[in-house]
Amino acid sequence: MKIVKYWDDFFDWVKGAELVELNEVNTKDDPVRPELDNKFRTAHGRKIFGLMDKKEDIEGVACVAFTNEIPSTVKELELMSKEADLVSAHRAGQVGSTAVADTLWSLKRGAGKKLMRELQKEIKKMPNIKQLVTLSPLTPMATHYHIRNGAKLIKINTTTQNFEYEIR
């Protein structure tokens, strides 16, 4: 059937997509926290991950901080990741016990789900990380995305919400 063939072609790029670490992103593309510059996103052990397709195009982005607690604001995220980074100097570079995805966005249909699955796999390789959580805005879109992708809502804050993903 033509529809099945079109559908397979439409999502074919997902099969070869892989998670890569990035040095920077166009922060204006970030629909969640465009005010955070690349310096913030990569300081104190924070990382930017991109979902790269076969053509080496970035189709989705996740910014992750490593902390020892679950933040409820960006300021807490900043302070907690700084603290975890300082402590890591005494633990052979193992930063924090909690990975916090503070912003995620996709540039292509299907990239968000694939990005989160690949991020879960990447986090599993980090022996010091015990949980993967988000610092998400209080929006129906964020709630729907995380619940649809298997996360559990663990806390609602004044301006954000935290979801927890199983580390697979």
Give a label for each model feature.
Residues 63-103:
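Conserved acyl-donor/pantetheine-binding loop and adjacent beta-alpha core of acyl/acetyltransferases
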Residues 105-106, 133-144, 157-162:
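Conserved beta-strand-loop-alpha-helix junction that forms the acyl-donor binding cleft
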Residues 147-157:
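Conserved acetyl-CoA-binding loop of GNAT-fold acetyltransferases
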Residues 58-60, 155:
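A structural microfeature
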Residues 99, 124-138:
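Conserved GNAT acetyl-CoA-binding A-motif
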Residues 1-44, 48-52, 57-58:
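Short amphipathic alpha-helix that is part of the acyltransferase structural core
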Residues 106-124:
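Conserved acetyl-CoA-binding loop-helix of GNAT-fold acetyltransferases
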Residues 50-52, 63, 164-168:
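Short, well-ordered beta-strand micro-motif
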